[in-house]
Amino acid sequence: MSSYNVGILGATGAVGQQMLECLQERDFPVADLRLFASARSAGKTVEFKGEKVVIEEATPQCFKGCDIVLGAAGDDIAKELLPHAVEAGATVIDNSHAFRMDGDVPLVVPEINGDDVKWNKGIIANPNCATIIGLVPTWPLHQVAGVQRMIVSTYQAASGAGVPGMRELEAQIAAMGKGEPMPEPSAFAAQLASNLIPQIGGFKYEGFTSEEMKLQNEGRKIMHLPELRVNCTCVRVPVLRSHSESITLEFERDITLEQAREVLASAPGVKLVDDRDAADAHDRFPMPIDTSDQDLIWVGRMRRDISNSNVSRGITFWCCGDQIRKGAATNAVQIAQLLVK
């Protein structure tokens, strides 16, 4: 088997660190690993497969010799540096928003549109975490009945804002437990502990936030459904890890609840956890505490959409997934695996 020189831009962040773990867990054929981060992190070491890897400063010239570069940096750094990686001969798989809606850049979820990697021109984009978590179970149902509309509410963990988000929530919880003054929020617009924040991203179209519009815009591109209609509300919740979503789908063809369950029970990347009707049911359904640090999207609470005038064409379900793994790092490594297949 061939092996590849792999670089990670943003190697010290939450997603970059998870990419390292995923490369190792999936036994990706790495010949030489290069880690790029800010000048502040340069010179530090990270362990990979029992060896110490020195972090290099990320510069336009740093990518020479890389075959694949995984991007885990913010939009501005991605726009500034990753085109230089392509010029140096690497194929880039980027987790930022910078290139997602570029017409020349495939936006890929391997379980859905893995073949799109074939038309890449040097950059492949990783979708937004909430998009991935919602679409992995939606896609197999679409293949059976044809999705026309999605109504989605997301419940997004603090770690969706990276390490600072997690640290801020932990500090607030600790202060509450000790009866101390609440630390001033900085990662979020308001206190998150014992609270919900119904805004993620800036306001864009018709009062929807940038995060809410991503699911429609990215979903249309990934599923090749330019007319897909999505109504999404995104909420930040006081959970450390794993996003949850309530999704109602409207179909163009009839689908029974039993059919939908059968489809999801065998769908790639999905785990059906919906034991309400089982003889030994314990009312166990997907929860973020169970889906953290693993790669499957758990689906449950499946039921008909009784608000639909044709109840045979509406399904509602609840899903949870680790947004750092499948919602970011794992999805990127899966794309890399498609490239070297």
PLM-predicted stretches and their roles:
Residues 1-192, 227-229, 257, 262, ...:
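N-terminal Rossmann-like NAD(P) cofactor-binding subdomain of oxidoreductases
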Residues 193-240:
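Oxyanion-binding "anion nests"
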Residues 259, 264-274:
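A common structural junction motif
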Residues 235-238, 321-326:
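Glycine-rich phosphate/pyrophosphate-binding beta-alpha loops
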